C-alpha cells in the first residue's frame, strides 16, 4: 500500500526525518511513538502530500509520490481523498460553520448529488458519535468533539488511510477512550490507521505496530505489540516519553 525508502526531510534550519524506510500494509493500525520533535508529525505531513521528501522514494499503490506529482492539483486532490488527515490542532481544518456543513464540504467537492451528500453526512456523524452536534459550530464544541467532527469530515471522503496527529492530546480520559474505541471500529471496517502519539500508555491496547522514533529523527524500531510484550525495558522506555 505505502512504501517509503530512505526518506529524508530537511527544514531550513534542522533535520526533520533521516533515512526512514517503512512499509504500510492495508488494515494496519500503526502508532508512531517518540519524543516531541522526533519526526512523527513530519512523517504524517509527507504521507498526506502536504510536503515532499528532500530525498528518498515514496510510493502509494506503486505510484511514486514526487514533487512533480504533487504539483498537479488533481493529483493532490486524489491523494487527499484517499489519505485523510486529522491535525493535532483541529482549528486549522474546521470552518466557522455548522458541523453538518463542515462534513458536507468534501462530498460536495467530489460532485456527489444532494441526496448522496446528505446520506454520507448522516452516516459519518452517526459513526463518529456526532449526530447530536449537527447544528453546532466549532466554538460550541469541546476538544474531544472537535476531534471527532474533524474525523467525520475526513471520513466523508471515504479515504483508505487515516492519519491522526496526537488525536488524544488534551482530551479527558472519557474522550480518549471514546476516540480509541472509534478508531478500533474504523479499523474493523477496513481502514488503515496511522496515528502519532507520545503516550504509550494511552495507545498500547489499540496499536498493532509501533514505529519508534529517536531524538535524531530516525526510526529506532518497528515492533509489533507481541514484540513489545517481550521487551519490558523497551515498554518502560516508552512510558517515559
From Swiss-Prot:
E.C. number: 7.2.2.-
Disruption of the gene: reported phenotype: Deletion of both larO and larQ leads to a loss of lactate racemase activity. Addition of Ni(2+) (but not Co(2+)) restores lactate racemase activity in this mutant.
InterPro entries: AAA+_ATPase, ABC_transporter-like_ATP-bd, ABC_transporter-like_CS, ABC_transpr_CbiO/EcfA_su, ECF_ABC_transporter_ATP-bd, P-loop_NTPase
Cellular compartment(s): Cell membrane
Cellular component GO terms held in the UniProt record: ATP-binding cassette (ABC) transporter complex
UniProt keyword annotation of Cell membrane present: yes
Primary location: membrane
ABC transporter domain mapped to chain residues: 2-240
Gene Ontology MF, one: ATP hydrolysis activity
Keyword field: ATP-binding, Cell membrane, Ion transport, Membrane, Nickel, Nickel transport, Nucleotide-binding, Translocase, Transport
Gene Ontology biological process terms from the UniProt entry: nickel cation transport
Induction data: Induced by L-lactate but not by a racemic mixture of DL-lactate. Makes part of the larR(MN)QO operon.
Function: Probable ATP-binding component of the energy-coupling factor (ECF) transporter complex LarMNQO involved in nickel import. LarO is presumably responsible for energy coupling to the transport system.
Family in the record: Belongs to the ABC transporter superfamily.
Protein name: Nickel import ATP-binding protein LarO
Gene (UniProt): larO
Amino acid at each position: 500500500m505505502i512504501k517509503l525508502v530512505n526518506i529524508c526531510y530537511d527544514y531550513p534550519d534542522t533535520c526533520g526525518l533521516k533515512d526512514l524506510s517503512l512499509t504500510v500494509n492495508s488494515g494496519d493500525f500503526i502508532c508512531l511513538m517518540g519524543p516531541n520533535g522526533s519526526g512523527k508529525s513530519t512523517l504524517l505531513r509527507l504521507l498526506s502530500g502536504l510536503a515532499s521528501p528532500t530525498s528518498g522514494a515514496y510510493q502509494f499503490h506503486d505510484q511514486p509520490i514526487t514533487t512533480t506529482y504533487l504539483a498537479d492539483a488533481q493529483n493532490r486532490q486524489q491523494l487527499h481523498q484517499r489519505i485523510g488527515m486529522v491535525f493535532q490542532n483541529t482549528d486549522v481544518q474546521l470552518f466557522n460553520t455548522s458541523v453538518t456543513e463542515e462534513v458536507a464540504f468534501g462530498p460536495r467537492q467530489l460532485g456527489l448529488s444532494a441526496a448522496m451528500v446528505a446520506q454520507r453526512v448522516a452516516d459519518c456523524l452517526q459513526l463518529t458519535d456526532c449526530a447530536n452536534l449537527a447544528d453546532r459550530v466549532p466554538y460550541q464544541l469541546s476538544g474531544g468533539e472537535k476531534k471527532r467532527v474533524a474525523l467525520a469530515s475526513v471520513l466523508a471522503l471515504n479515504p483508505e488511510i487515516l492519519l491522526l496527529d496526537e488525536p488524544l492530546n488534551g482530551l479527558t480520559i472519557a474522550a480518549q477512550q471514546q476516540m480509541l474505541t472509534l478508531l478500533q471500529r474504523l479499523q474493523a471496517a477496513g481502514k488503515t490507521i496511522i496515528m502519532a502519539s507520545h503516550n504509550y500508555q494511552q495507545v498500547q491496547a489499540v496499536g498493532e505496530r509501533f514505529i519508534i522514533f529517536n531524538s535524531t529523527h530516525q526510526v529506532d524500531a518497528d515492533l509489533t505489540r507481541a514484540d513489545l510484550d517481550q521487551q519490558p525495558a523497551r515498554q518502560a522506555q516508552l512510558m517515559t516519553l
